[in-house]
Amino acid sequence: MHGKWCVDNERIILVPYYYDIIDDFLSESDMDNYYKTFTHGGFPWTLITKVNENAEENDFQFAHKYIDDRVEVYDGAIEALRPIFRELYFAKYMSKDTEVYRAKTNLFIKTDTSRGLGFHHDITNMGDNYKTIIYYVNNNNGGTRFEDDTFVESVRNRALLFSGKIAHETVTQTDTNFRFNININYNSSSTPLIKENLNES
């Protein structure tokens, strides 16, 4: 886990802005199934004309929603995410009382130059007491950047978990036509991602 130093009322403190990186997160069969599903011609995508509120007007993407505002978008949507939920539960990042706010797959197309698409928080109407997992489906030189300039590269079968307190941005890829990731925002009192007691290790 990683902390972040910041200035708060003229005091320099370590705030609980943590993120974890877990490689080889899913089994090869589950990983391969996601990739084949997303690259199948019949998989439905929705055009998002602006990636986030801080993106440029022409920064677009495609998305496939499973859960939106705590509601399953279609029958079977939660089942499609079961491999990820299962691993999060066994790794103690989720518990039985977990509430999923939003879950979707993102599709970004290749750009001529690598660039950030705007720092943002995924959920803006629920405070910052939530967690995010970004699951990277394929290898490419794009990824996720935090405000402290930490860059997490999009590596196949990698999971990035972090506090909703942390602003982050998508970084586009230049080496593959498509970049896929699964983004899930959730809350669970048992998850270790936010530690209010800084004495905990």
Regions from the PLM with identified roles:
Residues G42, T46, R145, I184-S201:
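Double-stranded beta-helix
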Residues I133-Y135, T176-P192:
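A short hydrophobic beta-strand segment most commonly corresponding to one strand
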Residues H2-T98, S201:
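Non-heme Fe(II)/2-oxoglutarate
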Residues V152-H168:
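Conserved metal-binding segment of the jelly-roll/cupin
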Residues S114-F119, D128, Y136-V155:
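A short beta-strand-loop-beta hairpin characteristic of the jelly-roll/cupin
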Residues D20, S95-T113:
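A short glycine-rich, His/Asp/Glu-containing loop-to-beta-strand
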Residues G118-H120, A167-D175:
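Short beta-strand His + acidic residue motifs that chelate non-heme Fe in jelly-roll/DSBH
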